A protein has these predicted regions:
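Nucleotide/phosphate-binding sheet-loop regions of phosphoryl- and nucleotidyl-transfer enzymes
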Residues: 1-423, 450, 456-459, 466-471, ...
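C-terminal accessory/binding modules appended to enzymatic or scaffolding proteins
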Residues: 13-21, 433-475, 841-858
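Short beta->alpha connector loops at strand-helix junctions that form conserved
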Residues: 45, 482-484, 503-506, 594, ...
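Long, charged amphipathic helices and adjacent flexible linkers at domain junctions
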Residues: 69, 237, 399-451, 457-458, ...
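Conserved alpha/beta-domain cores
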Residues: 98-99, 551, 561-906
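Short His-Asn-centered micro-motif
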Residues: 251, 461-463, 481-483, 572-573, ...
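Glycine-rich phosphate/ribose-binding loops and adjacent secondary-structure elements
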Residues: 364-366, 459, 466-474, 486-493, ...
Length: 906
C-alpha cells in the first residue's frame, strides 16, 4: 500500500502524535500523544480519516479488503500488550470502537463498547473474573449498542419505540426495580437472549458471533455515522467540511463496571461555563461511560468543592451529601490524586482547557480521551486571559484562541439555560441577529411603539420589514419575520440595534387584518407571549426568562490586546447617537456608514419628506426640504458629537422614494389629510413612484441628480452641524459619501453641488471644517473603472451588500427561496450575503483598491456592508490592504478580534 492507513499506540509508544489531527482525527492524535507523554491509555490503533473518504468512494467490501492486513496486525499489537487474545474464550480481549474527526463533534457520531463478546467468550470471562454480573451487564450493553449502531435499529426519532429499551423496561417492571444495575445475572442473561431475538425478528439475520465480523461491522458503522443526520447538521452549524471525514479508533476495553473499586467519568481542567480555574467533573462508581452521558443515574462530583456546590444548589445537607453522594476526592482519594496530577499535566502540555474521559478498573486509572474543551464565549475569553497571565501562552496565542463569533454571546441578552430545557419550540427560522427576545406579539410598528410606551415588552411579527417599521423595531424586544434572509432589512437593522431577530420563518402565516399568526396549525393572537432566540433561530411559545450579558475585565483586556496587533481599523454602521455611543464603547474608531434615510421616519420628519415627494416643482421640493433641514442638522450634530474626534461617513439619500410613502389605503388617507390634498392625488403620486425593479431603479445618486435640492439640503445639514460643533469646541470629522455611482460623471455632478453648498455654509458660519467627499463602490462598473472614479473620490467605501447582489444577480430579499437548495446541493458553500465571496466579489474589491491607488496613492478604502462584521470577510479585507471594516455596533468586538487575528496570521 502506498499510504499508511492504520497507526498503532500503546505502552508509552505511538506511531502518531498530536500534530496529526488531519489524518488521525482529534481523538486518535491525542491518544497517540498521551502515550508519548506517559499518560496511562489502553493500547489500540487508529484508522485514518482518508479511509473514511475512501469508504464513500469504493464501498464497504473494498475497504475491508484494503484494510484487512493492517487491521489484523494492529489487533495482534493490542493482544501482545494486553496479554490476551481477541475472540479467545480462555483469555479474552474486548475492544471499543470510537469515532474522531479532526474537529471535536461531541456526541454526533457513534461508539461501540465491549466488542468481541459472544456466549463462549462471556463464559470464559466469568471464569476469569469470577464476576458474572459485570460480564453479562457488559454483554447486554454490547448487543444493544451493536443493534442500535451497526444494525441501525435505533429509532429515528424519540416518539418511536426503542426495541431494546422496551425489553429492559418489561424485565425491570416484572422484577420491580428502577435501575438497570439492580438487575440480577439471570435477568441480564435474559436480556441478551431477548435482544438477539429482537435483532433476528427485525433484520432477518442472527446476531454475529464471530468477533472479527463484529469488528468490521463496527468500523464501517462509524464511517457511516459521519453522514448521519445529526453529524451533518452539527457540521453545518460549526462550519466543518464534509470532506474531512472521521477516523476510527479501536482500543482495548477497560471496565468501570467491575465493582466498587471501578468507576467511569468525564472531567474538565477548568469550568467550561464560566472559565473558572477549577478542576471539575462527574463520575459514577461501577458503571460504563455512556451511563454518565445518558443521565440514567445521578453522577457524583469529582472534587469536594464541586460536590459541596452541587449539594447546595440541590438543597442537600452536608451530612446527606457525604453519606450518599461523596466526591471522588473523598471516596477514592488515591485515584483522585492521580487523576488531578494527570489533568494538570495534560493542560500544561496542551496549554489549553482539557475535556477528558477516564475509567478506573479495579483501582487502576486509564485515560480514554482528552481534547480541547468546548466552552461558552465568557469562558473562552477568561481562559485565554488567565492562561496568558499564568505564562502558559503568549499574547498572540491568546488572540488566536478566541473565536470571533463566540463574542456575540457576551454582547446580547441571553436565555436562562435552565429555563430553555423546559421551553416549547414552535418554529425554526434563520438566526438573523443574536440574543434573546421575549414579549407580547404585535403586528404593526405603530402598535409596537404604543405598547412599549405603555410599559409592555413586545415582539414585532411581520411578513417582512421595511424602513417604515424602524421605530417599531426599536421599541420591540425582538423581530420575527416570515420572509427575508440573514441580510434582509430586518436582519441588518436588528443587528445594528443589537436587537434579537429571527427571519425567514416559512411556517409563519401572518394575517395583519385579524392580527393573528398561525404556526403549524396553532393560532397565536396579538398580546400572546412568544420568545425568540436570534442565536439559534428558534421560536418558543410563552415567556422564557432572559438574563443580561455582563462584560468582564477580561473582555476589555482581550480587546486591548487586539488593538496592540491589528492593522485594520474597525468602524461602525450607526444611524443614531445612541448607536454611535454603543459602538464607541465597544472600541469603534469612527463611523463607516450613517444611513440618512432612517432619520426620516419620525412623525414630523415623514410629513415634510412626503411633502417633498408630493411637490411637482423644484420650488415646492425646496420648501419641504427647508422643513427637514433643522431635523437633519440635529441628527447629524448628535452623531458627530458622539463620535467627537473620529471620522463619520454619512451616505446621502439612497433608497427609492416609494419607500417613504404609504401603500395601504388607510395610510394614504392619513397622508392626504396631512398634505391637504385629495386621496386620488396621493394614489396617483404613489403609483407614479412604483418601479418594476427598484433595487436598480431611481435611487442613490440618481435621486440627487434628478432632485439636486436633496443633495444640497443634506450637505447643508451635515456641514452646518459640523460648523456649530467646531464653534462649541468639538472636533467633528464628517465624510460625505455619494451612493450608487457607476459613472464618473455622476460623481462629478454630485461633488459640484456638495462643494458649492460647502462654500456657502462656511461663509455663513465664518468657519471652515475639514471634510472629504467619497463614494460607495457597489456597482460592478464602478469597481471596474475605479481608476477613473478615484480622480474625483477621496475615499472608497465598498457597499458589499449591493455589490454582491449585482455581481451574483441575486436579490438579497428573495434569496431565501432558493438558498437552502443551493447549500444542500453544494452549489454554494455559504450564503454570499453573510460571507464575502472572495473569488468573485472579493476580486472586484481588490481590483478597485489597486486601480484606485494607482491614481490616488493615499486613497482610503473601507467596507461598510454587513460582511464588515463577519470574521473571514474581515480577514480578507486586511489581506488586500483595506484601511477599515465597518459593521453594526454589536459586531464591532467581533471585527476587532478578527482583524487582530488577521495581523497575527500574517
Amino acid at each position: 500500500m502506498s499510504q499508511k492507513r492504520v497507526f498503532t499506540f500503546g505502552n508509552g509508544k505511538a506511531e502518531g502524535n498530536a500534530q496529526m489531527r488531519e489524518q488521525l482525527g482529534g481523538k486518535g492524535a491525542n491518544l497517540a500523544e498521551m502515550n508519548l507523554i506517559g499518560v496511562p491509555v489502553p493500547p489500540g490503533f487508529t484508522i485514518t480519516t482518508d479511509v473514511c473518504n475512501e469508504y464513500y468512494e469504493v464501498g464497504q467490501e473494498k475497504i475491508m479488503e484494503l484494510l484487512n492486513d493492517d487491521v489484523m496486525a494492529a489487533v495482534k499489537h493490542i493482544e501482545t500488550l494486553m496479554n490476551s487474545k481477541f475472540g479467545d474464550a480462555q483469555n479474552p480481549l474486548l475492544v471499543s470502537v470510537r469515532s474522531g474527526a479532526r474537529a471535536s463533534m461531541p456526541g454526533m457520531m457513534d461508539t461501540i463498547l465491549n466488542l468481541g463478546l459472544n456466549d463462549e467468550v462471556a463464559e470464559g470471562m466469568v471464569r476469569k473474573t469470577g464476576n458474572p454480573h459485570f460480564v453479562y451487564d457488559s454483554y447486554r450493553r454490547f448487543v444493544q449498542m451493536y443493534g442500535d449502531v451497526v444494525l441501525e435499529l435505533k429509532p429515528a426519532n424519540k416518539t418511536d419505540i426503542d426495541p431494546f429499551e422496551e425489553i429492559i423496561e418489561q424485565v425491570k417492571a416484572i422484577r420491580g426495580v428502577k435501575l438497570d444495575k439492580d438487575l440480577s445475572v439471570d435477568e441480564l442473561k435474559e436480556l441478551v437472549v431477548r435482544f438477539k431475538k429482537a435483532i433476528k425478528e427485525r433484520t432477518g439475520k442472527d446476531f454475529p458471533n464471530d468477533p472479527i465480523e463484529q469488528l468490521w461491522g463496527a468500523i464501517c458503522a462509524v464511517f457511516r455515522s459521519w453522514m448521519n443526520e445529526r453529524a451533518i447538521l452539527y457540521r453545518k452549524m460549526e462550519g466543518i467540511p464534509d470532506e474531512w471525514g472521521t477516523a476510527v479508533s479501536v482500543m482495548a476495553m477497560v471496565f468501570g463496571n467491575m465493582g466498587d473499586t471501578s468507576a467511569t467519568g468525564v472531567c474538565f481542567s477548568r469550568d467550561a461555563a464560566n472559565g473558572e480555574n477549577l478542576f471539575n467533573g462527574e463520575y459514577l462508581v461501577n458503571a460504563q461511560g455512556e451511563d454518565v452521558v445518558a443521565g440514567i443515574r445521578t453522577p457524583q462530583q469529582i472534587t469536594k468543592i464541586g460536590s459541596q456546590r452541587w449539594a447546595e444548589r440541590a438543597g442537600i445537607s452536608e451530612e446527606e451529601r457525604k453519606a450518599k453522594y461523596p466526591s471522588m476526592e473523598e471516596a477514592m482519594p488515591e485515584i483522585y490524586a492521580e487523576l488531578d496530577a494527570i489533568q494538570n499535566k495534560l493542560e500544561e502540555h496542551y496549554r489549553d482547557m482539557q475535556d477528558m474521559e477516564f475509567t478506573v478498573q479495579e483501582g487502576k486509572l486509564w485515560f480514554l480521551q482528552t481534547r480541547n474543551g468546548k466552552r461558552t464565549g465568557a469562558a473562552m475569553v477568561k481562559i485565554a486571559i488567565d492562561l496568558l497571565h499564568e505564562g502558559k501562552i503568549d499574547e498572540k496565542t491568546a488572540i488566536m484562541r478566541c473565536e470571533p463569533q463566540k463574542l456575540d454571546e457576551l454582547l446580547h441578552p441571553v436565555f436562562d439555560k435552565k429555563a430553555l430545557a423546559f421551553a416549547k419550540v414552535i418554529a425554526q427560522g434563520l438566526p438573523a441577529s443574536p440574543g434573546a427576545g421575549c414579549g407580547q406579539i404585535v403586528f404593526h410598528a405603530d402598535d409596537a411603539q404604543a405598547w412599549h410606551n405603555d410599559g409592555h415588552k413586545v415582539v414585532l411579527v411581520r411578513i417582512e420589514t421595511s424602513p417604515e417599521d424602524l421605530a417599531g423595531m426599536s421599541a420591540a424586544e425582538g423581530i420575527l419575520t416570515a420572509r427575508g434572509g440573514m441580510t434582509s432589512h430586518a436582519a441588518v437593522v436588528a443587528r445594528g440595534m443589537g436587537k434579537c431577530c429571527v427571519s425567514g420563518v416559512g411556517s409563519l402565516n401572518v394575517d395583519y387584518k385579524a392580527k393573528t399568526v398561525e404556526i403549524d396549525g396553532v393560532v397565536y393572537k396579538e398580546g400572546d407571549y412568544i420568545s425568540i432566540n436570534g442565536t439559534t433561530g428558534q421560536v418558543y411559545a410563552g415567556e422564557v426568562p432572559t438574563k443580561a450579558a455582563e462584560l468582564s475585565g477580561d473582555f476589555k483586556e482581550l480587546m486591548d490586546l487586539c488593538d496592540k496587533y491589528t492593522k485594520l481599523q474597525v468602524r461602525t454602521n450607526a444611524d443614531t447617537p445612541h448607536d454611535a455611543e454603543v459602538a464607541r464603547a465597544f472600541g469603534a474608531k469612527g463611523i463607516g456608514l450613517t444611513r440618512t434615510e432612517h432619520m426620516f421616519f419620525d412623525d414630523q420628519k415623514i410629513i415634510a419628506m412626503r411633502q417633498m415627494i408630493l411637490a411637482d416643482t423644484a420650488e415646492g421640493r425646496e420648501k419641504a426640504l427647508a422643513k427637514l433641514l433643522p431635523y437633519q442638522k440635529a441628527d447629524f450634530k448628535g452623531i458627530l458629537k458622539a463620535m467627537d474626534g473620529l471620522p463619520v461617513n454619512i451616505r446621502l439619500l439612497d433608497p427609492p422614494l416609494h419607500e417613504f410613502v404609504p401603500h395601504d389605503e388607510a395610510g394614504q388617507q392619513t397622508m392626504a389629510k396631512e398634505m391637504g390634498v385629495d386621496l386620488a392625488t396621493i394614489k396617483r403620486r404613489v403609483a407614479s413612484l412604483a418601479e418594476n425593479n427598484p433595487m436598480l431603479g431611481h435611487r442613490g445618486c440618481r435621486l440627487g441628480i434628478t432632485f439636486p435640492e436633496i443633495t444640497a439640503m443634506q450637505t447643508r445639514a451635515i456641514l452646518s452641524a459640523a460648523c456649530e460643533l467646531k464653534k462649541e469646541g468639538f472636533d467633528p470629522k464628517p465624510e460625505i459619501m455619494v451612493p450608487l455611482i457607476g459613472i464618473l460623471n455622476e460623481l462629478k455632478q454630485q461633488k459640484a453641488i456638495i462643494q458649492k453648498v460647502a462654500a456657502e455654509v462656511f461663509a455663513e458660519y465664518g468657519i471652515e471644517v475639514e471634510f472629504e467627499i467619497g463614494t460607495m463602490i457597489e456597482i460592478p462598473r464602478a469597481a471596474l473603472t475605479a481608476d477613473r472614479i478615484a480622480t474625483e473620490a477621496e475615499y472608497f467605501s465598498f457597499g458589499t451588500n449591493d455589490l454582491t447582489q449585482m455581481t451574483f444577480g441575486y436579490s438579497r430579499d428573495d434569496i431565501a427561496s432558493f438558498l437552502p437548495a443551493y447549500l444542500e446541493k453544494k452549489i454554494l458553500k455559504v450564503d454570499p450575503f453573510q460571507v464575502l465571496d472572495q473569488n468573485g466579489v472579493g476580486k472586484l474589491v481588490k481590483y478597485a483598491v489597486e486601480k484606485g491607488r494607482e491614481v490616488r496613492p493615499t486613497l482610503r478604502c473601507g467596507i461598510c456592508g454587513e460582511h464588515g462584521g463577519e470574521p473571514s470577510s474581515v480577514k480578507f479585507c486586511a489581506k488586500i490592504g483595506l484601511n477599515y471594516a465597518s459593521c453594526s455596533p454589536f459586531r464591532v468586538p467581533i471585527a476587532r478580534l478578527a482583524a487582530a487575528q488577521a495581523a497575527v496570521e500574517e
